């Protein structure tokens, strides 16, 4: 029997639920539900027969491909470490040391950290500012077009949308 979640086959997770073996590896909860961890009965590390997040070939690859179709991206990746790890990975994947990157002044500190670690040349631009409430709101397409025209050699542009205050920017990707 194979479960499906959004069209993705989950045969391996079904097999894990039926497995009557005690695991002597991480994670430490040993697939037990005693700790109230949702999904612990199928939580397993990269062992033979399981997929590997860093070299996906099975369920993880299927999920990444499905995400690519949903978001109409060339490639999608699952990640760990939260958004900070994802931001670092994305910037390192696109930019080499010394490259130019354009970032909005309201970006998360992990963007600044990534730029420092990668030794990037940073060009800043300012999203619209709400003087009444005292924070940056959204970025306009005209602002993006202008900063890109002035920095055609930039490898990437980082825009926070939605912002921490919930404002969104309607920016057309020029890929």
Where are these regions (language model features)?
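Short hydrophobic alpha-helical runs that function as membrane-insertion/retention elements
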Residues: 77-78, 102, 122-126
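Substrate-binding/gating loop at the entrance of the active-site cleft, primarily
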Residues: 103-122
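Conserved N-terminal alpha-helix of the aminotransferase class I/II PLP-enzyme fold
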Residues: 39-85, 106
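Active-site phosphate-binding strand-loop segment of PLP-dependent enzymes
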Residues: 133-175
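N-terminal "arm"/small-domain region of PLP-dependent enzymes with the aminotransferase-like
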Residues: 4-58
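Conserved beta-loop-alpha segment that forms the PLP phosphate-binding cup at the N-terminus of a helix
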Residues: 74-98, 114
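Short, acidic/turn-prone active-site loops that include or flank metal/cofactor-
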Residues: 106-109, 126-132
């Amino acid at each position: 029997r194979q479960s499906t979640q959004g069209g993705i086959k989950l045969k391996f997770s079904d097999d894990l639920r039926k497995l009557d073996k005690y695991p002597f590896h991480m994670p430490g909860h040993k697939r037990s539900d005693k700790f109230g961890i949702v999904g612990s009965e199928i939580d397993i590390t990269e062992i033979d027969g399981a997929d590997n997040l860093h070299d996906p070939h099975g369920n993880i690859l299927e999920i990444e491909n499905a995400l690519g179709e949903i978001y109409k991206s060339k490639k999608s990746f699952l990640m760990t470490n939260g958004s900070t790890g994802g931001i670092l990975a994305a910037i390192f994947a696109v930019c080499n040391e010394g490259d130019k990157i354009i970032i909005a002044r309201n970006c998360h500190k992990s963007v600044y950290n990534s730029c420092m670690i990668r030794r990037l040349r940073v060009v800043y631009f300012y999203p619209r500012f709400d003087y009444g409430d005292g924070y940056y709101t959204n970025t306009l397409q005209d602002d993006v077009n202008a900063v890109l025209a002035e920095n055609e050699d930039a490898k990437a542009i980082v825009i926070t949308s939605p912002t921490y205050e919930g404002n969104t920017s309607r920016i057309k990707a020029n890929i």
